[in-house]
A protein has these predicted regions:
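Long, low-complexity, Ser/Thr/Gly/Pro-rich intrinsically disordered segments that act as flexible linkers
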Residues: 1-377
Length: 377
């Protein structure tokens, strides 16, 4: 539920005011904090995401297409029978190879374990993260529960969700690789340097010279690494996508507790599978992209921090204004630095390869909160 959705459900003002300010304002109003400028600015978003339009986001998962069609039909029938509810848009997630992102890289490999969930950390995760970082009402990494909406029946066991939709400019990405790589091997190596992993998901740290599909597919190994032996980023560049969004034990100029910025995420890809034959002219179709969805008890703070400091700036690893080569906003040609001896290699011409098409801050209520909300009607 968005803040406007809670208002439409009749939540009293006294309770609405207990929600955090960024959530109350909505994602579009936080464009400056999110660095959603230029092509990513709210005025360029799809209508469904324009301010005030989206009240509720319903996600339906199923084991196969037939089960999904059945679930969607049921949902549409129930919506049609519900007074005061209008379906303003829908999007079918799930590319043919949904485990990979639009650029052909295996995605959603690194996820934090949650303390008390019964799921042990995989090799490479030092320890489980306090449950209060993800679910409201429990101990967080600072030793105390984070603030939550009141009353407790509304806030406790709920969480916040960030939803962001991107169109992926796969053709421009391919053209960039071809402009800076003479051979197919050169292009694959550059792409891996930009992501921090090979397409299979194998981390550069463990397989620096070539892809290793067996390693990439093994959850007991594909996340079992750190950066202590690569402080200068000569194997995994300091500014690559993976190292920015999960610095692990990297030495950071901007001091922060990495664990308070961990998220449980799901990137849902849509559109045709990746092909190296996709050209820049094909990007105009807008048929490839992903929904970036994550939950966190401080989701609004985390995404704004990530967008400001880790994605659209490089000061925290002494890279100045250099930005994330995959999801950063490059209003002019950007730069990507690959540290190497004797001199680092700088590659110009990085573009905005993922263009923002809309998003919203959402509150995911608990079962007790759903009951409380129903009682307000």
């Amino acid at each position: 539920l968005s803040f406007e959705g809670l208002k439409a459900l009749g939540v009293p003002d006294a309770q609405l005011k207990t929600f955090p300010l960024p959530f109350q304002q909505g994602m579009a109003a936080r464009a400056e904090q999110l660095r959603d400028f230029g092509p990513n600015a709210p005025e360029n978003w799809e209508d469904v995401f324009k301010p005030g339009n989206c009240h509720l986001a319903l996600t339906i998962y199923a084991v196969d297409d037939a089960a999904l069609d059945k679930a969607l039909a049921t949902a549409r029938t129930e919506l049609d029978q519900s007074s005061g509810v209008t379906l303003i848009g829908e999007h079918r997630f799930g590319a043919p190879d949904g485990a990979k992102n639009p650029f052909g890289f295996r995605d959603s490999i690194s996820q934090p374990a949650v303390e008390g969930s019964g799921v042990d950390p995989l090799p490479g995760e030092e320890r489980a993260i306090k449950a209060g970082e993800f679910i409201l009402g429990y101990e967080s990494e600072n030793g105390q529960p984070l603030g939550m909406p009141e009353p407790a029946a509304l806030g406790k066991n709920g969480t916040f969700v960030v939803l962001r939709k991107y169109n992926s400019r796969v053709g421009c990405f391919n053209a960039f690789l071809k402009a800076h790589g003479e051979t197919a091997e050169d292009r694959e190596r550059l792409a891996a340097k930009m992501f921090g992993r090979w397409r299979s998901g194998a981390p550069l740290t463990l397989s620096p010279d070539h892809d290793d599909p067996d390693l990439g597919a093994d959850p007991q190994r594909n996340n079992d690494f750190n950066f202590k032996d690569d402080p200068k980023g000569r194997v995994v560049p300091l500014g690559c996508h993976m190292r920015r969004l999960n610095p692990r034990d990297s030495e950071l100029t901007l001091l922060t507790d990495v664990n308070i910025h961990r998220i449980i995420r799901r990137s849902s890809t849509f559109g045709p599978v990746y092909s190296e034959d996709v050209a820049p002219k094909d990007d105009a179709k807008g048929d490839r992209g992903l929904f970036f969805i994550f939950i966190s008890a401080r989701a609004y703070d985390t995404i704004e921090f990530m967008q400001q400091e880790w994605i659209n700036r490089g000061n925290f690893v002494d890279l100045g204004e250099e930005r994330d080569p995959i999801v950063g906003l490059h209003e002019e040609d950007g730069r990507f630095t690959i540290p190497q001896a004797p001199a680092r290699k700088r590659i110009d011409g990085v573009q905005t390869f993922n263009v923002m098409k809309g998003g919203e801050y959402l509150f995911m209520p608990s079962l007790s909160a759903l009951k409380w909300l129903a009682e307000q009607r």
